Amino acid sequence: RQIFTQYINYEITPTVAVGRNVTLPDGNGASWLAEGIKVLRINVPFQAPEPIHPIKSILIKRFNLTYGPHSNAYGPDASSDALSAELALPFGFPLRVISTTNEITIVDEKNNKPITTVNGVKSPAETELNVVSTDQTEGTIYLTLNPSSMSLPEQSDEARREFEMFQKEFTFTKEDIKLFNGSSRSLSETPVGTVLLNGIKFSVESGLLGLQGLNQYPTLILGVDVVGGTRANINLNVNTSIYNPSNVNLGVGDTTLLMVYEIVVGSVTIPNMRLNIGNNTLQAMSKFNPNAGPQGLDMLNRYISGLDTHLNISGYEDSTHIASLKPAFSAVRVNTTLPGLKTKLVQSASLKVLESTGITDDVAQTQVSLDNPFTSVSYTHLRAHET
């Protein structure tokens, strides 16, 4: 098995050719020569005639990246049930890979620096390999990466910056291509039995589809409800829709963004944010301060009047408690629209002029019908002007 693995990896295996016997062309032995042959020892370096590179490519269809409550800020869990690798071997016999353990180091091709290593655990695999000739077997291995921790290549400020930049590039690019270096430990079924191929090396380009700054598709505010407040803020529940255009399911914990209407007028927090691939409907909590400035009051008046208001949702330094995500999250800028209130607060109003109105005083009788679409708002009094 070791010789087979080293052969595939284009490594030299020191072997010794040992003389055993001599047979002449007529089939008879030559005892006088055999004794000399038996003591013959020849060192023979055993190596493939050229590099094989058995793993030709890795395709990531779907990936999961999760920061749990106790995760290392630079060591999230990675997993996938949709990985595949194209394999080609210079052997003409059937092979079926039944499980793999993969260690993958993601490398930035621009500076050739390692970014992070995925220390894979043993995971099942399925194989579609075909013997295409007497000296060629090729096909696809479908891999599963069970939850495995990522780790930095070294504990240094430079290594942490590389990982931060990797996540920032993923956040803002359409496709993030990197070099995937590593080794695979494969348990394979062959005509001669089950064989463990230990340490099959590979180096291929692969990548992830990026988040594109979450601006590829509109971020929608689907509904707003007042659920409480203080002297400083009105507390809102916000129903929102965010589209994830990448091929990565993300779990990034509590996330807070600023609500900007020319000035900062509040904040929006998405607890335990998970962005799955495609469209996500999320519940957020917002603290809105209408007294932040004239813009805050204008925004409130527009909302109550049924007018849409264009806002910007912006990241900042404290958008996340996860240190490695701070550079990416603080640069997020997402445009959205707060739809105006669809329900008219004043449903109807009537004025009755009394016999004394305008004679003894200016008092008239009014009746107003109000609607309250908010969960935690109670009307205590109404002040109005009639013209």
Language-model features: where?
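Eukaryote-biased detector of low-complexity, proline/serine/threonine-rich segments
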Residues: R1-D26, T144-R185, K287-H321
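Short beta-strand elements of extracellular/lumenal beta-sandwich folds
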Residues: D77-L89, A232-Y243, T360-D371
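Intrinsically disordered, low-complexity Pro/Gly/Ser/Thr-rich segments with frequent PxxP/GP/PP motifs
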Residues: R1, T117-S156, E262-Q295
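Extended serine/threonine-enriched, polar tracts that run as long, contiguous segments within proteins
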Residues: G92, I106, V248, L257-Y261
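Short beta-strand elements
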Residues: G29-I52, V195-G213, L325-T343
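Conserved small/polar residues in nucleotide/adenosyl-binding loops
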Residues: T380-T387
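A short beta-turn/strand-edge loop motif at beta-sheet boundaries
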Residues: F91-S99, S246-V252, F374-Y379
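Low-complexity, acidic Ser/Thr/Pro/Gly-rich terminal tails and inter-domain linkers that flank the onset
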Residues: P51-N72, G210-V227, T337-G358
